[in-house]
């Protein structure tokens, strides 16, 4: 019982120390590798669930002291709550934190650092010891080369060089070498510093050849300066097919018929070992030849060819290089090959002499139709331009150093050419006229192959009644030449033969020579009778106008063309074959309006109130485009159409009218035409009434005139008395000048009105009665009182004389008329008169 007590206490303490291990979790590499002087990078993570880390101690080979319940060992690193680190711990760095990172770095690392590293972690309530193995060697340890399970030639593989070391403070590099020489291929280097693994790796992609079999591949570890540290080597095991080479006796593989030949197939390399051997000639396997040696005794020319051996292993078969075995012999009977046969005349032809021989023939003899061709000693005969006489049989004989061959049967050369000397022959008697039936034949001299058809170049409609014969019915005038061709594979054309067809003149037409522009009246005009062709060329001309013969010259001339020359012209041209007429050609003469006249409808006598139409008729080319109307005073009327319509017509419209027509050539005017408008019965009645009134007025005036005459005589008898009085009597005749009408103007015409006669105007001046004497009057008693039969008045009269022969609807050129003015002024002697205002009575009588 006493013995169990201490052990039970130890178990309890151990349990208390490790009872909470489930609360700590660590991740890091189990073992780290390094060498003397290098460094160690220890990636590490942890988890403490009860709080942050308060204390961390790195032990070297820690041991638990049961007496003190603590770990003893070399303390490489120790961190306290104040974070201070002793100076002797500078080569060890804690790169972690108080949460989860526990990464460490030891630089430099020494061999005596090998062993266990203990990470003593303490939080507020928990403790933990984590162990990591460290392996430090005296010298750098070598990397390890990893190869694929199998390597075959020409198949790409990846070589891997792995080193279980990596540290940030100590750079290294891995280099690949093949047989001590750096490899040309680029390697890919990668490093890993994770909690899972720490390493440096280099991968090289490589396509090995069979020659790499057994070669040494090295992965060399170097420091940053390229200094060698360590290496690893492997020997390549490259699987490949057998590598072969043929050796021949004799070495040049050239023998004559009957000689012996030995061929040996040497295997220079095979991995794995070869299993089968076979021989082939020109791709065909030789039976019962399964060894590396091939023996051929008494060879023949048929054994000439390409030989090679084929050896197989587990990787596959391999063929050797070919060996060409030449068995020499004299030329065999020759044959001739003709290139491009049958040959076309003018083309090139090449003959080839073919004869089996070894060595090849060095001399040839050629024959044409059994006759030797001088100077032809080559294998080929070339004729650049073949001719018909080259046709025939060609043969040859070949010769080499072993002998002369035999002449073969030869080859036939067929030279083809178009028909020769083709001609076109006219079968008709000459001359040939238009409309005749013509027969022609096509002839030739020779042809190869034979003529199979004919072609013709002819105008119009034709037929070929038999092969090589042409028949043309109703030959045309323009069928000038005809040619034929005889055809086999090609056509040969004969020279065109002229038919010389005679025909009447063609394309007769009238052509205006001058003027080049429009023809105006008075121009000089020339017309030409043209035709395109005539055979025979001797011709005669005839001119016609409206069916009337004019002349027999080729030209028709007009010195001064007139409108009467206009019309339809045609010309005729004839020769000994016939005559041809032109189409009618219209000669158009342009002239100004002429023969103008004014026609009146319904006539030149029209009653007033009716309608009258005046038409301006003319002859013009081109037609009148503009009309102008004038009256008898040459006054332009506002009418510009061909017809002047007066509706209703008035007496004042009576008079002479004329018109003027204008076209693009010029102007023309008509003579005067008079329109007479007479009164209607109603107007005549009114005029008669006015005339009677006028006669009555004249009668009254005559009576008054007699009275005035008597008074005047009385006045003359009392001249003495009048000398003392202030009365005066006088006549004034106002003679107005009338101008004669223009001789070129129209005559004053119209309806005469007899009531339009003389007119008399009267004026009476009356003096008031007075007794007051006037200054300057004679104071004679005789003159104090007027005569009893005298009246103190003044009579003033004007007699207007109408112009005889005038018409009332014709306005005179001048309004002044001839008039006789008569006045009488009488004032009696001084006497008393009653005071009264003087006045004037004025009377005008119009009729």
Curated annotation (Swiss-Prot):
It is a single-pass type I membrane protein. Residues 20-138 form the Ig-like V-type domain. Residues 143-235, 242-324, 331-416, 419-500, 505-582, 593-676 form the Ig-like C2-type domain. Pfam families: C2-set_2, Ig_2, Ig_3, Ig_CD22. The modification Phosphoserine is found at residues 725-726, 729. Phosphorylation of Tyr-762, Tyr-807 and Tyr-822 are involved in binding to SYK, GRB2 and SYK, respectively. Phosphorylation of Tyr-842 is involved in binding to SYK, PLCG2 and PIK3R1/PIK3R2. Phosphorylated on tyrosine residues by LYN. GO terms for molecular function: carbohydrate binding; CD4 receptor binding; protein phosphatase binding; sialic acid binding. A motif (ITIM motif 4) lies at residues 840-845. Residues 20-687 are extracellular. Residues 709-847 are cytoplasmic. Glycans are attached at residues 67, 101, 112, 135, 164, 231, 295, 363, 428, 445, 448, 479, 574, 634. One of its GO terms (cellular component) is recycling endosome. GO terms for biological process: B cell activation; cell adhesion; negative regulation of B cell receptor signaling pathway; negative regulation of calcium-mediated signaling; negative regulation of immunoglobulin production; regulation of B cell proliferation; regulation of endocytosis. Disulfide bonds join 161-219, 265-309, 353-396, 442-484, 529-571, 616-659. N-acetylneuraminate binds at residue 120. A motif (ITIM motif 3) lies at residues 820-825. Keywords: Cell adhesion, Cell membrane, Disulfide bond, Glycoprotein, Immunoglobulin domain, Isopeptide bond, Lectin, Membrane, Phosphoprotein, Repeat, Signal, Transmembrane, Transmembrane helix. The chain crosses the membrane at residues 688-708. Residues 1-19 form the signal peptide. A motif (ITIM motif 1) lies at residues 760-765. It comes from the Eukaryota. Contains 4 copies of a cytoplasmic motif that is referred to as the immunoreceptor tyrosine-based inhibitor motif (ITIM). This motif is involved in modulation of cellular responses. The phosphorylated ITIM motif can bind the SH2 domain of several SH2-containing phosphatases. Most highly expressed siglec (sialic acid-binding immunoglobulin-like lectin) on B-cells that plays a role in various aspects of B-cell biology including differentiation, antigen presentation, and trafficking to bone marrow. Binds to alpha 2,6-linked sialic acid residues of surface molecules such as CD22 itself, CD45 and IgM in a cis configuration. Can also bind to ligands on other cells as an adhesion molecule in a trans configuration. Predominantly monomer of isoform CD22-beta. Also found as heterodimer of isoform CD22-beta and a shorter isoform. Interacts with PTPN6/SHP-1, LYN, SYK, PIK3R1/PIK3R2 and PLCG1 upon phosphorylation. Interacts with GRB2, INPP5D and SHC1 upon phosphorylation. May form a complex with INPP5D/SHIP, GRB2 and SHC1. Belongs to the immunoglobulin superfamily. SIGLEC (sialic acid binding Ig-like lectin) family. This is B-cell receptor CD22. It comes from Gorilla gorilla gorilla. The lineage of its organism: Eukaryota, Metazoa, Chordata, Craniata, Vertebrata.
């Amino acid at each position: 019982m006493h013995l169990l007590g201490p052990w039970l206490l130890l178990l309890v303490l151990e349990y208390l120390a490790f009872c909470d291990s489930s609360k700590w979790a660590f991740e890091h590499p189990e073992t780290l590798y390094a060498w003397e002087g290098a460094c160690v990078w220890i990636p590490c993570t942890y988890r403490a669930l009860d709080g942050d880390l308060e204390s961390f101690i790195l032990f070297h080979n820690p041991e638990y002291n049961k007496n003190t319940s603590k770990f003893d060992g070399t303390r490489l690193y120790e961190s306290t709550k104040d974070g201070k680190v002793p100076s002797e711990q500078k080569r060890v760095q804690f790169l972690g934190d108080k949460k989860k990172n526990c990464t460490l770095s030891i630089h430099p690392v020494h061999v005596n650092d090998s062993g266990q590293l203990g990470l003593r972690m303490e939080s507020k309530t928990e403790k933990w010891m984590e162990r990591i193995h460290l392996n430090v060697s005296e010298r750098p340890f070598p990397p390890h080369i990893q190869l694929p399970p199998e390597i075959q030639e020409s198949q790409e593989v990846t070589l891997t060089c792995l080193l279980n070391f990596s540290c940030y403070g100590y750079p290294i590099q891995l280099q690949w070498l093949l047989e001590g020489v750096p490899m040309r291929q680029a390697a890919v280097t990668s490093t890993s510093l994770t909690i899972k693994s720490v390493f440096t790796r280099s991968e090289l992609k490589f396509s090995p050849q069979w020659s790499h079999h057994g070669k040494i591949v090295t992965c060399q570890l170097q420091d940053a300066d390229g200094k060698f540290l360590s290496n690893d080597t492997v020997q390549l095991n490259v699987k490949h097919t057998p590598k072969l080479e043929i050796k021949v006796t004799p070495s040049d593989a050239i023998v004559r018929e009957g000689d012996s030949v030995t061929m040996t197939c040497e295997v220079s390399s095979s991995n794995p070992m070869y299993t089968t051997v076979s021989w082939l000639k020109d791709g065909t396997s030789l039976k019962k030849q399964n060894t590396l040696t091939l023996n051929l005794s008494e060879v023949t020319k048929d054994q000439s060819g390409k030989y090679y051996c084929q050896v197989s292993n587990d990787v596959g078969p391999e063929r050797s290089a070919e060996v060409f075995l030449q068995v020499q012999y004299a030329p065999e009977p020759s044959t001739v090959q003709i290139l491009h046969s049958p040959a076309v005349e003018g083309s090139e032809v090449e003959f080839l002499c073919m004869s089996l021989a070894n060595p090849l023939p060095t001399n040839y003899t050629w024959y044409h139709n059994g006759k030797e061709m001088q100077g032809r000693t080559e294998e080929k005969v070339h004729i650049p331009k073949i001719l018909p006489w080259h046709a025939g049989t060609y043969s040859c004989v070949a010769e080499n150093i072993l002998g002369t061959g035999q002449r073969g049967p030869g080859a036939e050369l067929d030279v083809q050419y178009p028909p020769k000397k083709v001609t076109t022959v006219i079968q008709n008697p000459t001359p040939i006229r238009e409309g005749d039936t013509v027969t022609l034949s096509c002839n030739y001299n020779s042809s190869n192959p034979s003529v199979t058809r004919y072609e013709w170049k002819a105008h119009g409609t034709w037929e070929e009644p038999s092969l090589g014969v042409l028949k043309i019915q109703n030959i045309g005038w323009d069928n000038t030449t005809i040619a034929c061709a005889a055809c086999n594979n090609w056509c040969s054309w004969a020279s065109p033969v002229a038919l010389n067809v005679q025909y009447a003149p063609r394309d007769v037409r009238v052509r205006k020579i001058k003027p080049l522009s429009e023809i105006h009246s008075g121009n000089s005009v020339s017309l030409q009778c043209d035709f395109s062709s005539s055979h025979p060329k001797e011709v005669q001309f005839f001119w016609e106008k409206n069916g009337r013969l004019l002349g027999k010259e080729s030209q028709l001339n007009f010195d001064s063309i007139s409108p009467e020359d206009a019309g339809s012209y045609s010309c005729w041209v004839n020769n000994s074959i016939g005559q041809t007429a032109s189409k009618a050609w219209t000669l158009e003469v342009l002239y100004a309006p002429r023969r103008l006249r004014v026609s009146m409808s319904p006539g030149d006598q029209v009653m007033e109130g009716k309608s009258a139409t005046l038409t301006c008729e003319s002859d013009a080319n081109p037609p009148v485009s503009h009309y102008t109307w004038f009256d008898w005073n040459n006054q332009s009327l506002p009418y510009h159409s061909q017809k002047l319509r007066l509706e209703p017509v008035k007496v004042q419209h009576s008079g002479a009218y004329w018109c003027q027509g204008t076209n693009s050539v010029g102007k023309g005017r008509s003579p005067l035409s008079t329109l007479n408008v007479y009164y209607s019965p109603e107007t005549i009645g009114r005029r008669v009434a006015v005339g009677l009134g006028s006669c009555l007025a004249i009668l009254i005036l005559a009576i008054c005139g007699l009275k005035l005459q008597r008074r005047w005589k009385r006045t003359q008898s009392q001249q003495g008395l009048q000398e003392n009085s202030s009365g005066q009597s006088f006549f004034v005749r106002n003679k107005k000048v009338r101008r004669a009408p223009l001789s070129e103007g129209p005559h004053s015409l119209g309806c005469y009105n007899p009531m339009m006669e003389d007119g008399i105007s009267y004026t009476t001046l009356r003096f008031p009665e007075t007794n007051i004497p006037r200054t300057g009057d004679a104071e004679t008693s005789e003159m104090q009182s007027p005569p009893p039969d005298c009246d103190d008045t003044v009579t003033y009269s004007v007699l207007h004389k109408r112009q005889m022969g005038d018409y009332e609807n014709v306005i005179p050129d001048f309004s002044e008329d001839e008039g006789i003015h008569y006045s009488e002024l009488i004032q009696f002697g001084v006497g008393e008169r009653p005071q009264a205002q003087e006045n004037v009575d004025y009377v005008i009588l119009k009729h």
